[in-house]
Amino acid sequence: MESRFKLKEEYHQSCCAIQVRVPVIKTSSTKRKNQLYTTGPFIMRSSSPSQPPSIKAQHRIAKHKAIRRRRIDLNCGCSIFYHIKCADHGFTHRGEHHCASGREFRFYLGGTKSPLFQDHAGGRSSIHTDKDIPHPNQVQSQPQESTGSPQSIPELPSLDDIDSSFWDDIFK
């Protein structure tokens, strides 16, 4: 078998290599060193790192396995394909959120089963509380707002109280 290519750079356990044209090299072996051995559905590559493994076997397997996808045609004219396993996840396209399932659609638009509009008994906690034991109020009161200046900053004079000679010196 004759080889007209040699590897310029090798990558350990990778299928990528840069090939350059060189003079013909005659090899004594007729078998390729990276021959694939198949045992049922599994493929075992040889451990020789001198040549990159062939990707043809992976492509052959991938052609037989059908990918289950669903197509969505959007109002903007774009088409999106999403995997069946991703059915409960929406996506955003050009700033607009799109729902990928009926359950998610109810969530965003507030259908009857939407968690946004469920009444959960006033937000009570699920922890058992004894009504005979007095509990302090756990909500901290906020200080009342005032229109005056804070205590740490002294009150500044009004800009109207500053005489015009001060402003004349600044804007000369």
Swiss-Prot record:
One annotated Gene Ontology cellular component of this protein: host cell cytoplasm
Predominant location category: host cell
Region Transactivation, residue ranges: 158-172
UniProt feature, compositional bias: Polar residues: 137-152
Key words of the record: Activator, DNA-binding, Host cytoplasm, Host nucleus, Host-virus interaction, Inhibition of host innate immune response by virus, Metal-binding, Phosphoprotein, Suppressor of RNA silencing, Viral immunoevasion, Zinc, Zinc-finger
Residue ranges covered by zinc fingers (unnamed): 76-93
Motif (Nuclear localization signal): 56-71
Keyword Zinc belongs to the record: yes
Post-translational modification: Phosphorylated.
Region listing for Disordered, in residue ranges: 119-172
Family, similarity comment: Belongs to the geminiviridae transcriptional activator protein family.
Subunit relationships: Monomer. Homodimer. Homooligomer. Self-interaction correlates with nuclear localization and efficient activation of transcription. Monomers suppress local silencing by interacting with and inactivating host adenosine kinase 2 (ADK2) in the cytoplasm. Interacts with and inhibits host SNF1 kinase. Binds to ssDNA.
Protein name, as recorded: Transcriptional activator protein
